[in-house]
Amino acid sequence: MAEITNIRPSFDVSPVVAGLIGASVLVVCVSVTVFVWSCCHQQAEKKQKNPPYKFIHMLKGISIYPETLSNKKKIIKVRRDKDGPGREGGRRNLLVDAAEAGLLSRDKDPRGPSSGSCIDQLPIKMDYGEELRSPITSLTPGESKTTSPSSPEEDVMLGSLTFSVDYNFPKKALVVTIQEAHGLPVMDDQTQGSDPYIKMTILPDKRHRVKTRVLRKTLDPVFDETFTFYGIPYSQLQDLVLHFLVLSFDRFSRDDVIGEVMVPLAGVDPSTGKVQLTRDIIKRNIQKCISRGELQVSLSYQPVAQRMTVVVLKARHLPKMDITGLSGNPYVKVNVYYGRKRIAKKKTHVKKCTLNPIFNESFIYDIPTDLLPDISIEFLVIDFDRTTKNEVVGRLILGAHSVTASGAEHWREVCESPRKPVAKWHSLSEY
């Protein structure tokens, strides 16, 4: 019988030595774990602090300023009111939890077919701060923070903006410093203050878009933020216009527009050094001369199946959004709102290099018949860009909050003609 040879190495180590080695390894592991945890904890605390007082933004055709400073997603808890009478005697109302959201609930107008619903709080607006409300809804003095476009308060002082313009010849860069604003109006009746920030765009190309940080509860904000735009020849400065949009941050809805400042660089000569300017903030002119194009959509409702079919057919005459003048890459995003809450969102495929895209894409939504008066459908035509942020070309709203005659008529025909597809062209409005 052959002898079996054990080829495994043998280790003659004392149990005491092995125990000491194991204890040492354990101590090292615990120490490393504690060190890593402390570093992560300190880094998390630093992120929660306010941003530094002054930013230097180095841009080359794109905005690198962190959008998360003012565009964090806020979630408002929604609950059902079991005690409220609601519409038709037994329907429950959709309410915003005022205790957690910081909002005061308001009573619905018992008159009209839309009482008991919160569709008058739909977060879709004509502009940054102008909500679309149904005709039967009236505003009390404490409910609105913005002035209606038809308000007689046309001569209200909106404050002033101070900034400077400079040009770096070696780097061929335009340097704009937003310094401060004075005398801003109160946009929040509860705090008697405002949370201002500024968006700046270089017209007419709209390729350079930046914004400052939000300064809380102040009517005289000091931003002191510098933005550097590379790749702008000095010879082209005379054709450019600086557009400053002054806004107030709103955590519960779209930010409110305070006003705007338009500065043509044709009258500014930064060749000899920094030029400091102060301009009055004026009411924003929402009547834009540029056409946003048209969108054709088809809607049909099946009352038996309680199903809404939305078909995005095509668009035409879309504006060129690229500085190079090339055709865009449009797609359509469809948002469905029930009252204040968005209940569905979908989008079409991107159509490459065209200003007259044909989509022919359908989306189906299960919507009970009794909820139709509270439903609004928002269509956003968006220009896709691989290098910069996608830009909204225009918007269309159908439903109870449609502000255009064609939109209201389209929705009425859909509700009055069940099982029949109704297709119409609509002009897009500015987002």
Swiss-Prot record:
Q: Has UniProt tagged this entry with the keyword Membrane?
A: yes
List all topological domains (Cytoplasmic): 37-431
Which GO MF terms does the UniProt record name? beta-tubulin binding; calcium ion sensor activity; calcium-dependent phospholipid binding; identical protein binding; metal ion binding; SNARE binding; translation initiation factor binding; ubiquitin protein ligase binding
Record's Gene Ontology CC terms? axon; clathrin-coated vesicle membrane; dendrite; dendritic spine; dopaminergic synapse; early phagosome; excitatory synapse; exocytic vesicle
Q: How does it sit in the membrane?
A: Single-pass membrane protein
Q: Where in the cell is it found?
A: Cytoplasmic vesicle membrane; Perikaryon; Golgi apparatus, trans-Golgi network membrane; Recycling endosome membrane
Q: Which InterPro entries match?
A: C2_dom, C2_domain_sf, Synaptotagmin
- Provide the protein name: Synaptotagmin-11
Which is a Pfam family this sequence falls into?
C2
Family, per the entry? Belongs to the synaptotagmin family.
Instruction: Describe the PTM.
Output: Ubiquitinated, at least by PRKN, and targeted to the proteasome complex for degradation. Ubiquitination is inhibited by ATP13A2.
Predominant localisation class:
membrane
Provide the alphabetized UniProt keywords: Calcium, Cell projection, Cytoplasmic vesicle, Endosome, Golgi apparatus, Lysosome, Membrane, Metal-binding, Phosphoprotein, Repeat, Synapse, Transmembrane, Transmembrane helix, Ubl conjugation
What job does this protein perform? Synaptotagmin family member involved in vesicular and membrane trafficking which does not bind Ca(2+). Inhibits clathrin-mediated and bulk endocytosis, functions to ensure precision in vesicle retrieval. Plays an important role in dopamine transmission by regulating endocytosis and the vesicle-recycling process. Essential component of a neuronal vesicular trafficking pathway that differs from the synaptic vesicle trafficking pathway but is crucial for development and synaptic plasticity.
Instruction: Name the coenzymes or cofactors required.
Output: Ca(2+)
Q: What subunit structure does UniProt give?
A: Homodimer. Can also form heterodimers. Interacts with PRKN. Interacts (via C2 2 domain) with AGO2 and SND1; the interaction with SND1 is direct. Interacts with KIF1A; the interaction increases in presence of calcium.
Q: Which GO terms describe its biological process?
A: autophagy; calcium ion regulated lysosome exocytosis; calcium-dependent activation of synaptic vesicle fusion; establishment of vesicle localization; learning; memory; negative regulation of cytokine production; negative regulation of dopamine secretion
Q: What organism is recorded for this protein? A: Homo sapiens (Human)
Gene expressing this chain: SYT11
Residue numbers carrying Phosphoserine: 134
Recorded domain comment: The second C2 domain/C2B is required for the inhibitory role in both clathrin-mediated and bulk endocytosis. The transmembrane domain and the first C2 domain/C2A are critical for the inhibitory role in clathrin-mediated endocytosis or bulk endocytosis, respectively.
According to the entry, every stretch annotated as the C2 domain falls at 157-279, 291-426
Say if the entry is tagged with keyword Phosphoprotein.
Answer: yes
Residues that span the membrane, as ranges: 16-36
